[in-house]
Amino acid sequence: MTIRSVVLGCGSYLPQRVVTNAELASRIETSDEWIVQRTGIRERHVAADGEFTSHLAINAARAALANADVDPQSIDLIVLGTSTPDNTFPATAVAVQNGLGIHHGAAFDLQAVCSGFVYALATADNFLRSGSFKRALVIGAETFSRILDWNDRTTCVLFGDGAGALVLDAQQQGGTAADRGVLSTHLRSDGRHKAKLYVDGGPSSTQTVGHLRMEGREVFKHAVGMITDVIVDAFEATGLSAETIDWFVPHQANKRIIDASAHKLHIAPEKVVLTVDRHGNTSAASIPLALDVAVKDGRIKKGDVVLLEAMGGGFTWGSALVRW
């Protein structure tokens, strides 16, 4: 027998305000056609004044707990993937824990930029499989609108705010790819590329928050190869393949990257879950947001094999295979 981290439920939250490409085109030199052609993005959500990353995360966590039909007091681990915490410290996860009325167990943030949710999922999975904890909330939440240079049309059109969450439960399974739960996780990073996607501020370096800076062509050039390599690792570890997975839920950064990755891996287009058009790139929140959409609309069902992947600044990247 093997302990697996089984998904009990999922949830998400999006800020009320929607910013369309047309609105951006009225403020900066861009157009709906230019944005859609290069990214596939049509609109994104932006947090209101006074609405913090913790608020988004708490709402997503509550939705996931309700979907799982579990008592918040049964949660003994919260791992929050975010690059936009409320404060330098304490961890935003602690604010989430308190907001949910949980005063036991452990809660901490994990920062791997757009790979943050996959990193958080892998971390929680390892804690559950080790027996250290029994039930976890894994959250991705971001307010990237707060770190954008709204005069830089190459970056400000790409990102949005939001949060998504999963409830994981440690359960005894048979130890095969037929098990429900997290079947594999693979994480990678290479700091040689850190200057290609970064924020030009920080408490130690500039004592300011800073703005996101990106060499878009360089990111695109590396993304497809890195993503596909770490997915091949997942397939080899589990004996699964592009043919045997049911759904591919990638980080929603750019439709061209998603399409190219699916094509290289021979994943059928109808298996790809796309939400980048309506959410934009929500960094660590993008995968759980997309998962929640596909669960709510009936595509992802119990027993389905779901492939997750992400790549973010650092570079960091990773994959996970989950049987729902």
Curated annotation (Swiss-Prot):
EC code(s) of this entry: 2.3.1.180
Primary enzyme class: transferase
GO biological process: one example: fatty acid biosynthetic process
GO molecular function: 3-oxoacyl-[acyl-carrier-protein] synthase activity; beta-ketoacyl-acyl-carrier-protein synthase III activity
Keywords from the UniProt entry: Acyltransferase, Cytoplasm, Fatty acid biosynthesis, Fatty acid metabolism, Lipid biosynthesis, Lipid metabolism, Multifunctional enzyme, Transferase
Catalytic activity: malonyl-[ACP] + acetyl-CoA + H(+) = 3-oxobutanoyl-[ACP] + CO2 + CoA
Active site location: 114, 251, 281
Annotated GO CC locations: cytoplasm
Main subcellular localisation: cytoplasm
Highest taxon, organism lineage: Bacteria
UniProt-annotated stretches for the region ACP-binding: 252-256
Lipid metabolism recorded as keyword: yes
Record's subcellular location: Cytoplasm
Free-text comment on this protein's domains from its UniProt entry: The last Arg residue of the ACP-binding site is essential for the weak association between ACP/AcpP and FabH.
UniProt name for this protein: Beta-ketoacyl-[acyl-carrier-protein] synthase III
Source species: Bradyrhizobium sp. (strain ORS 278)
